[in-house]
Structures are given as C-alpha cells and as structure tokens.
Amino acid sequence: MTTGLPEDVTGGPPAAETPARPAAPRPALEVTGLDVHYGRGRGRRRALAGVSLSVAPGETVGVIGETGSGKSTLARTVLGLVRPSAGSVRVGGEDVTRYGNRRWRALRRRGVVQYVFQDPLRSLDPDLTIEDSLIEPLLIQGRGRAEATARARSLLDRVRLRDDLLARMPSELSGGQRQRVAVARALMSGPELIVLDEPVSALDSANRVQILEILKELGAAGTALVLISHDLGSVAGTADRIAVLHHGALVETGAARDVVNRPAHPYTRLLVGSAPTLRTASADRARREALRALPHT
C-alpha cells in the first residue's frame, strides 16, 4: 500500500533535524575600510588608512597609539564628528557613515552611543549640580524626574560614590570623583557603546586602578567599551582586545594578553617596551581587590 510518505530507506527512525545555530549578535560597533583625510590640495593628508574594527556587545577594546597615530580621529569619526573619505561606520546596527548633525543628535538622545572625555569637566556642566547633570539625558528623553533621580542614585552606587554627592557642584569633587560621575552620566541612558578618551591618564594611581576596575565591570555587564589611550599598560588589564594604530593604519589587533606577551609588529613591541605600567600589572590587580573593599567616597 502506498502511503504517499517518504520511505525510511534505513529501516530505522527518521533522523533528527540538526538544530540551527543561533545567529551571532550584531556588533555594537563595526568600522569597515575607514579612510579619513584632512586638508585639501598639496596640504591634504591621510589620517586613517583602511581601518576595520568591530566591537561585540560587552566587549572592551583598547585603541592604542602615540600622538598623531589616528586614534582620536577614529573616535571622532565613530561619534559622527568627522566625515570619512571612504569606508563605513555602523553603531548599534545603524549605518551612520553619512548621518548629518540632526540624525546624530537623535541617535545620541536615544542613548545608543556615549562619549567620556579625558577631562570630565567637559562632560559635566559646571553650573549644574551633580544630580542635574546626571538626570539631564533622561529628562531630554521625556522621562520623569523621580525615575531619573532614582537611576542616578543607583549609578552613583555602581561607580562607588555616595549619593549625597548629588547636591554638590562639579568643582567640589576631586578629579577621580568627577571622572566616575562622568562614567555614571554616560550610563544613564543605557548605551550599547561608550567611547572613552584617555579615561585614566590624568588620575593618580589609586583612582586609575579604581576607574579601570569599574570599566571592567561594565564590560562584564554587557556594555561595549572603546578605550582610547596612548599608554598600552594603562588598559592592558582591562581590555579584552587591543588594536594598535600607527600613522593611521591598524598594524596589529588581537587578544590583550597576546598583544602584550607576544607582540607581532615592531611598533607594538616598542609600545610594550616603553610602557612602565605593564611592570606593575600584578600590583594593580592586588590593589583592585583591596579597593573593592573600601567604602564609597
């Protein structure tokens, strides 16, 4: 009798279907073939040359290079402040390469990407209290003040600051406290990506270690981070991957441990050899554990 069903030629039960692999999460940041030029005519120079880089959700990537290497240009291009000559930039899945100022402002208001300056006072309005500086991004989104203030208190705790600092002005805080407030402000809107420009270069050793530990925790919680720095040693213990820029070209990228212990490019070897903070990496780890036990400041 013909059933119309396919025969099992093996005589056994039908083979189970192979489950489809889950799709890889889209990158929080994807830079492809990026070229940037400054100037015109004979004065035209190339600041970035074919740079490609991706950052996964929850990944921390350190972009390292000396002054003039192109790292700040890369950050400014990712943030829509510089228009590339060629290539593309995708932030949070959106191709933002040709976004104008209006669309970029809308993207920032939605909180997809945030930026933390080297000088935290550039992130904080000197005429606003810490509370007003923190809640401003959520108020712009139309959220209520009570909700915004509750989140501000929660984030101050996350960056190990007391919530009684909400009533203070930025000028009343130490440099390390201001930098932690700037990080908290960047987190207010729940961004997928935060770009930080030299986040610890102006801090003393204790504050440097504490900020880097906070950043490491943010990455573990799912926020993608790009750390811009001239000092390989300052981010080697925090970054998952290191990307090395030299004269506008990406000369090496890899797991942070591999780049530090087995640098492939001569320029990277030079950076490793000239990074005094690498020699104190184990001491930094010990200090992180001690600092975690300290009360909030």
Where are these regions (language model features)?
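Conserved ABC ATPase signature
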Residues: M169-L173, Q177
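Conserved ABC ATPase "signature" region
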Residues: E147-D164
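ABC ATPase NBD coupling module
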Residues: R42, V96-V113, D132, I140, ...
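ABC ATPase "signature
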Residues: T253-G254
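Helix-to-loop junction immediately C-terminal to a conserved catalytic motif
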Residues: L79
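A short, surface-exposed alpha-helical micro-motif characterized by mixed small hydrophobic
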Residues: V235-G237
